[in-house]
Every structure is written in structure tokens, then in C-alpha cells.
Amino acid sequence: MVSLSTSTSHAPPLPTNRRTAERTFTVRCISISPREPNYAITSDKSNNTSLSLRETRQSKWLINAEDVNERDSKEIKEDKNTKIASRKAISIILRREATKSIIEKKKGSKKLLPRTVLESLHERITALRWESAIQVFELLREQLWYKPNVGIYVKLIVMLGKCKQPEKAHELFQEMINEGCVVNHEVYTALVSAYSRSGRFDAAFTLLERMKSSHNCQPDVHTYSILIKSFLQVFAFDKVQDLLSDMRRQGIRPNTITYNTLIDAYGKAKMFVEMESTLIQMLGEDDCKPDSWTMNSTLRAFGGNGQIEMMENCYEKFQSSGIEPNIRTFNILLDSYGKSGNYKKMSAVMEYMQKYHYSWTIVTYNVVIDAFGRAGDLKQMEYLFRLMQSERIFPSCVTLCSLVRAYGRASKADKIGGVLRFIENSDIRLDLVFFNCLVDAYGRMEKFAEMKGVLELMEKKGFKPDKITYRTMVKAYRISGMTTHVKELHGVVESVGEAQVVVKKPDF
């Protein structure tokens, strides 16, 4: 790996140059591995929390009288905070509904307040509610005070690109021209993004050539970076090289974002030679230096591939060159150590985060909950699940999948029932991956009635089983020797279309 260091100092395994905060925040955690000792966080006399390693033959949850009092006090506080949060949430919802009601009632009115309409439009653009956003935009154009604004058009076109609506984006582009707006390179870049995000590369290239032939709308590094990212997402690496060559001919030099996009894509594709070559090119640029995104992409590439030693070496070199880690860095380290079964080092990262008061995100909780679930430490997993809720971090579908998988491995069908009851009392948006995890968990426990019941639950929630669903059921029946059921499902598997499931990766 190329050296990144700009100094002769040797970086420690975890950074030590961050100033300790005055306010303490205690997170109790125990790392347990079937082959590793039990690790617990304890507090010393100087109030600096640390992780002490305590070896035990069995996983034990240590609770004394002080812990009970502390827990009761915390539960009262959590209940109070929950009520306050609920009142605030209701207040926000009521304000939004009032705004929506005003917009709906005054359709056709030409005297709405600018702030009311613009805030409503901004809210819908941010939430990617493209149909509603277009409706509000049409209402905006009817107002007496309306004047065409290029910035609003650009935001709408970018939103439509993210929502895979290139035709609508093109319609807005034409309307913008009809209204007399001056089309600049930012508008063209937004439309290029809309085309490329939907895989309409021919249209994107046609627009790129039009930009190159114009005098005042020349493509810039941002335009090329968007195209490069779109091609990398479909693994069209040859097209990426063509774009890089075209950039050089145009006299456009890649920036840090361009290089980071390439490094991240090569890492995900496990093309480590190309990834390192790109990093070397980046280091050769005078005005293009690696940053935390560069470090995180590199660490994720090696850590995700199980190359823990290489990941640690890269971490040291990046840090010795002056690049500070952030919460995403630690999430990557936790995920890599957890999946490789190195709970000792995972605990060291948790200790460091606690010592220097890095606030945990939902990704952090999802990573450690999954790790403890894999290790079979259900008590610690459940403690973290409660803790994230007390910290007002609402569980996601990823969180629930980790819980269901862990309970399935431990044959805790009643616990899975608890997860389902939790879902019924929440507004978590489920996905097909969750239901497939549920099928797998019941299949492992030979709970075939409950496994079939998942299909009914899927239909109730508006989901259709895919090939993964049925293949998981076939596997469970085959292991139990239920050949009749296996034969019945084989025909169903072949008749079902290929799975269209997009697994959301952690936002490291």
C-alpha cells in the first residue's frame, strides 16, 4: 500500500489526538464471542470509562442493587423523554398538515404567501415526493408574485433524477426554456444527472456533446464526476476510462470527489490493484489531497473483504498523514471487526468512541447489535436495542433483521413474536429482506406453521414472495426431510420472477 504519511510519527491503532470532552456519556457493553472471553465496560475512580476484559466461561449479565436503582431511574427518565418527544412530533405533524390543508384548499388562488408555498415545495423536494412537488410547483407558477427562477428548476430536475423520472425532468427543462430562463452548465449537469441515474446513457452523452460544443455551458469536473459515478454503479469500468480520457482532452482535472468515487467503486468491486493505482494518482496531484472519504472507502474495501491487517495498516497511514477519523470511520471498524469475530478489537473501538464522546448513530447501533447477535449474546443485543430507543434513535428495518436472525439462531420463537408486536405498534417501513429473514428464522426452528404464516403477513403488508423466499422455505423443508413440500414448492420457485430486492448498505 502506498505511504500516505507526511510525518515520521507512527500512528497508534486508534487515534489519540482528540481532546477529551468534559461531559461524560456512559455506554455499558459486553463483547462476547463463543471462543473469546467476556468483555465489560467499567468505570474507574477518575470517572474515565474504560473497557475491562473479564474472562468467564459463560455469558453473564451482571446486575447489582446499584444497577437496579440506576435502571429504574433511567426508565422513568426515558418515559418522560418519550412523552416530550411525542408531543413535539404531534406538533410538527399538525403544522405540516395545516400547511398541506392551506395548499389544498387554495388551489387556483393567485395570492398565496411566498413563504407558505416555497416551504411546502422545499419539504417535498427534500423528501423526494416528486408528484406532490410538481403540484406545488404548478401552484407556485400561478402566483402573481412568481418570477422564473433557475435555482428552483435545477432542484426539481435533480429531484426527478433521483426519483428515476428523466422524462419529467426533460419536460421541466423545456418549460424552463419556454419561460425565458438562461440555461447554464448547472442546468445541463442536472439533466445529465437525471438521464444517467436512470441508465439513459445515450441521452446523457448526447447532452454532454451539446455542452462541449456550446460557448457558455462547458462541462466541468462536476458534470464528468456525475457520469463517472453512474457508470461505476453499473460496473461499466471501460466507459469510465473513456470519460477520464475525455476529461484530460478537455483540460479538466479530476478533483477529490472524482477520485473518491473511483476508489470507493473499485473497493466495492474488490479491484484492489485499480483502487491503489487511483490512490497513487490522487497523491500525485498538487491540489487534490485524500480526505476522510478517501480513508473510509479504503478501510471499507479491505475490512469488508476480511483483510483486517491491511485495513489497520491503512488506518495508521491515513491518520499519520493528518486525516481525522469520523463516526463513519468507526462504524466501518466496528463492522469489520464484528463480522470477522474480533470482538476484542471491536470493544477497543467502542471504548475509544465512548472516551472521546462520539455520538452513536443508527448505523453504529445496527452494526453492534448485529455483531452481538452473531456472537449469541442476546442480553447485550437487547440492552443496546433498548438503549438506542432511549437515545431517541428509532430502529430501522436493518435493526429488526439483526434481531430476527439472532433469535432464529437461538431458537427463541417467542422473542420473534415480540419483534412482530413491536412492529405493529410502530410505523417502521418493512421491506422484502425482513420477511425473508423471518422465513429463514422460523425455518431454522422448524416452526413451519409460523413460516407459512409469514406469507400471509407479506400479503397483508403488500409484499409478494420472491425466489429467495421460496428457496429459503425449500431449504427448511429439505433439512427436515419433508420431501412432499419440497416438490410442491419447486414449481412455484420456477414460476416466480427474479428477485428485485435492493439491499440497503450501511451509510458508512
Swiss-Prot record:
GO terms for molecular function: mRNA binding. Its main location: plastid. It is found in: Plastid, Chloroplast. GO terms for cellular component: chloroplast. Residues 1-10 have a biased composition (Polar residues). Residues 1-28 form a transit peptide. Residues 1-22 are annotated as: Disordered. InterPro entries: Pentatricopeptide_rpt, PPR5-like, TPR-like_helical_dom_sf. PPR repeats lie at residues 149-183, 184-214, 220-254, 255-290, 291-325, 326-360, 361-395, 396-430, 431-465, 466-500. Keywords: Chloroplast, Plastid, Repeat, Transit peptide. Belongs to the PPR family. P subfamily. This is Pentatricopeptide repeat-containing protein At5g48730, chloroplastic. The lineage of its organism: Eukaryota, Viridiplantae, Streptophyta, Embryophyta, Tracheophyta.
